C-alpha cells in the first residue's frame, strides 16, 4: 500500500542511530506514525515542519515507512526568533498528537492548523487563527463550546459568562448570582466561535481566551498530561511579559 499527502510533523521519536518514528498530521489520512531513515538532510526535520510525505507499507495497519519526506516550510526559520509563537506551535502540535486518534482524518482541523501556521510564518497577526484552531480541536473531538445563546434562558443578548461544567454561554441575568463560579465570556471568543469577527484580538483578550480554552482542553482531552498545564502557564507568562515590555 502507498499514498502521498501533505501534513505537519507533530512528534519525532529517535529509533536507533539512523532512524526515527515520525508522526505527521496529514490532511487526508490523519495522524500517521511511520519509520523514516535519516540522512544529513532529514536530520534537520523538526516538529512543526510542513511536509509532503509518501507512506508505504505491506498492510494498512502496519507501521510502514515514509519513503520520502520533503519539507514545504521549515518551523525553525519561521519561529526561532519569536518564543511565544514557538510555544503556541509546540502546544498545539502536542495537543493534536495526544488527542486526535491515529489514522482518523480531520481535514477541517488540518486546514485550521495550516491557517494558523501561515499567519504565524508571514509575521502578521496570528492570535485569532490560534484561538480558532483550539476551538476547532474541541469541536472536532466532540467537546464543542456553545457560545451562541444562553444555556438557561436561550437568549442571544448580554452573554457575559461561560459555564466551566458545560462549556455553554450564560447571560448576565442567569449568571449574576453565580458569577464567581463562571468564566467571563470574552466577546472575541464568542465572535470567533460564531464566525462573525474580523478584527484581531488584543494580547489581553488572547491571554484570557488561552486560560479558558486551556481549561476545557485539559478537562476533556488532556487530563492525564501534567505538562500541558505547565506549558500553558509558560505561554501566558511569556505573552504577559511581552505586553508589559
From Swiss-Prot:
User: InterPro entries annotated for this entry?
Assistant: ARFGAP/RecO, DNA_rep/recomb_RecO_N, NA-bd_OB-fold, RecO, RecO_C
Keyword Amino-acid biosynthesis: yes or no?
A: no
Signal peptide (from-to): none
The question of whether Transmembrane is a record keyword is answered with: no
Query: What SUPFAM superfamilies does its record include?
Result: ArfGap/RecO-like zinc finger
Which BP terms from GO are recorded?
Answer: DNA recombination; double-strand break repair
Record's keyword terms, sorted: DNA damage, DNA recombination, DNA repair
- Annotated GO CC locations: bacterial nucleoid
- Xref: NCBIfam families: reco
The entry's family comment says: Belongs to the RecO family.
Q: What does this protein do?
A: Involved in DNA repair and RecF pathway recombination.
Recorded protein name is DNA repair protein RecO
What organism is listed for this UniProt entry?
Anaplasma phagocytophilum (strain HZ)
Q: What is the lineage of its organism?
A: Bacteria, Pseudomonadati, Pseudomonadota, Alphaproteobacteria, Rickettsiales
Amino acid at each position: 500500500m502507498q499514498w502521498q499527502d501533505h501534513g505537519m510533523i507533530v512528534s519525532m521519536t529517535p529509533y536507533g542511530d539512523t532512524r526515527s518514528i515520525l508522526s505527521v498530521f496529514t490532511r487526508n489520512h490523519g495522524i500517521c506514525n511511520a519509520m523514516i531513515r535519516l540522512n544529513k538532510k532529514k536530520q534537520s526535520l523538526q516538529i512543526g515542519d510542513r511536509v509532503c510525505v509518501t507512506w508505504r507499507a505491506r498492510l494498512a495497519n502496519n507501521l510502514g515507512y515514509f519513503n520520502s519526506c520533503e519539507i514545504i516550510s521549515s518551523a525553525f526559520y519561521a519561529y526561532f526568533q519569536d518564543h511565544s509563537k514557538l510555544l503556541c506551535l509546540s502546544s498545539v502540535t502536542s495537543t493534536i498528537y495526544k488527542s486526535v486518534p491515529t489514522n482518523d482524518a480531520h481535514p477541517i482541523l488540518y486546514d485550521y492548523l495550516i491557517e494558523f501556521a501561515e499567519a504565524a510564518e508571514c509575521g502578521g497577526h496570528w492570535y485569532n487563527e490560534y484561538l480558532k484552531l483550539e476551538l476547532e480541536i474541541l469541536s472536532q473531538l466532540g467537546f464543542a463550546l456553545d457560545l451562541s445563546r444562553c444555556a438557561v434562558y436561550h437568549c442571544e443578548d448580554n452573554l457575559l459568562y461561560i459555564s466551566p461544567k458545560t462549556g455553554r454561554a450564560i447571560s448576565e441575568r442567569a449568571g449574576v448570582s453565580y458569577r464567581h463560579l463562571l468564566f467571563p465570556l470574552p466577546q472575541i471568543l464568542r465572535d470567533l466561535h460564531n464566525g462573525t469577527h474580523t478584527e484581531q484580538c488584543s494580547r489581553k483578550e488572547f491571554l484570557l481566551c488561552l486560560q479558558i480554552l486551556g481549561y476545557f482542553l485539559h478537562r476533556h482531552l488532556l487530563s492525564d498530561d501534567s505538562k500541558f498545564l505547565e506549558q500553558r502557564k509558560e505561554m501566558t507568562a511569556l505573552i504577559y511579559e511581552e505586553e508589559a515590555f
